Amino acid sequence: MLEKVIERYLVQRVKAQGGVAYKFASVAHRGVADRVVCLPGQTWFVELKTTGGRLSELQKVFREDMLRLGQNYAVLWTKEDVDQWLLTTTK
């Protein structure tokens, strides 16, 4: 499945949960997450990948930085991952 299909699905599902999913791009830093997702009471950095896709080294550094700083971070590969992630984060 194409990454843009999963990304579009994420945006729709987050909106249905009362949140927003901002496209995140940084000209100064490569490897940042694809989306910053704001749900009621929480903010997540979300990286989207195609099935079998892997994080680049820069994406791994970004993930570790965010986790070290106590931020929420998720990598999602499929629509099912999006649904499962939303189930666990919106309980």
Mark where each language-model region is.
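Catalytic phosphate/metal-binding cores of nucleic-acid and nucleotide-processing enzymes, i.e., regions
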Residues: 1-91
